[in-house]
């Protein structure tokens, strides 16, 4: 399990942090370029990349209806934050020698989806890491294998919502 659950200011958030052997500029492109996002992010993304810019998320397999978001922070190549439905995703990049420390924080609308979303983001991020490294994607459909670990770690209150449809 890569994600941790935090409770601050009355809200729950998931946090993932990993050092990557790539410069911030390369990681930034993977986080913001629609062609790169298609390799690891769960939806297609249309975005006006500036604070206040409109976003549109469309699931590739029609798992759910498209939905809108908004760019909240855009500071290349350091911070990219946006509304993801009722949640807020914040990607932060910090140079670290010849690499980058990537931190993803997902501020959740409700605690009950923490295990579901934690498993989902872990699988997505593993696909991102593989894309950056030029290696094979480690089974992008392995959510079912990862989810039970998050349920066990986060507990029943963080596990009330099941798998994405």
Task: Please identify what each model-predicted range represents.
Residues 1-44, 165:
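Hydrophobic ligand-binding cavity/cleft-lining segments
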Residues 5-11, 49-51, 73-75, 94-97:
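Short, ordered beta-strand-loop transition motifs
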Residues 11-17, 54, 66, 79, ...:
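Intrinsic-disorder/low-complexity, polar/charged segments enriched in Ser/Thr/Lys/Arg/Asp/Glu/Gln
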Residues 38-86, 161-165:
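Glycine-rich portal/gate segments that line the openings of hydrophobic small-molecule binding cavities
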């Amino acid at each position: 399990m890569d994600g941790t659950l935090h409770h601050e200011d009355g809200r729950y958030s998931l946090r993932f942090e990993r050092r990557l052997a790539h410069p911030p500029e390369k990681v930034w492109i993977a986080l913001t370029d629609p062609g790169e996002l298609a390799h690891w992010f769960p939806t297609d993304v249309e975005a006006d990349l500036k604070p206040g810019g409109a976003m549109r998320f469309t699931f590739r397999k029609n798992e759910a209806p498209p939905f809108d978001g908004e760019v909240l922070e855009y500071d290349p190549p350091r911070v990219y934050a946006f509304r993801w439905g009722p949640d807020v995703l914040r990607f932060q990049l910090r140079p670290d020698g010849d690499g980058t420390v990537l931190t993803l924080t997902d501020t959740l609308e409700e605690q009950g989806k923490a295990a579901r979303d934690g498993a989902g983001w872990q699988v997505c991020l593993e696909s991102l890491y593989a894309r950056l490294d030029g290696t094979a994607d480690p089974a992008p459909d392995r959510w079912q294998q990862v989810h039970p670990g998050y349920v066990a770690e986060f507990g029943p209150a963080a596990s009330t919502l099941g798998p994405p449809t």
